[in-house]
Amino acid sequence: MDNNRSMHVTLLPFSDVQAAIGKAREEWKETTDFNTAHHSEEEIDAVIPTGKEDFPFRHVMSSFFPTRFGHWVPLIAASQGASCWHVFEIPRYLAQELAGLYARAKDSDVGHSIVETLDDVISRLYTSMRAVRGLGDILEESAAEKPRSFLMPFNAAMGPARECRVFCPPGKGRISAISQYRWTEPFRFQSTDNANDEALVIYEGARAIYDRIMESAEKMQDSSIRGKMKEEGFTFDVLRTPSGEVQFVEINPFGAMSGCGSCLFNWIRDAKLLYGMEQQVRLQFAV
């Protein structure tokens, strides 16, 4: 990984974020200032033209396959200090039924709590739009594959308010930017007076996790995983725990055409930064 990049921390007044959200609500639409996704090929190609020396790739809808949780669960578990986990297959008929009812079940109605029974697992699945979409993606990708559900040891430190999203553009072999994950509220710094120091800890932790991700990808038997990651890029989420650790949470697709939210960035407005065309790595937080 290229370590010769300067880091710049931007602390946005949270009042600016609130104003953007309020304006969008008055107009009965989603804000376009932050957390955009699902842009058209024409939109992103106008800012990052394809076929150029600095971007020899095509803008595509990123593949779901390389970012599957199952590929990365050993690395995620190790990062969070977990030595074991459980996995079970969901019969396709049940997955189809769950998908018809309402993707890791992070947005479930019950929130961040312990799963103790099979009923708890089912409840997490059918009350989570993300989980339902994840089931649907697998059912569409394969006519025979059974979706799998992973049960990890409960992590009391887990919380979206302390998570960050890390952007890794195609072909650059590095991190281009980092944003707080839950962009609709101020980031939980231990002290805003030391925000720059805490941001540096997050950056260094994210770089170490990036290196481990790429090392793991190189060791995988399916070479298409690392090939897709290099051609399409990827994002991953990290958790800054109250004790100061930086843990790996999950990996997601990259790009303006993907469904991956840009958090405090905008995929088009900030395309040069996110796609690695700028020299600096920017970390952006609302305070």
Residue spans of the language-model regions?
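Conserved N-proximal alpha/beta basic substrate-recognition cap immediately N-terminal to
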Residues: 1-125
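Residue-identity detector for glutamine
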Residues: 18, 80, 96, 180, ...
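Generic recognition of cysteine residues
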Residues: 84, 164, 168, 260-263
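Phosphate-binding site of ATP-dependent enzymes
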Residues: 109-200, 205-229, 233-248, 253-254
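C-terminal active-site "lid" helix and adjoining low-complexity regulatory extension at the edge
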Residues: 229, 242-287
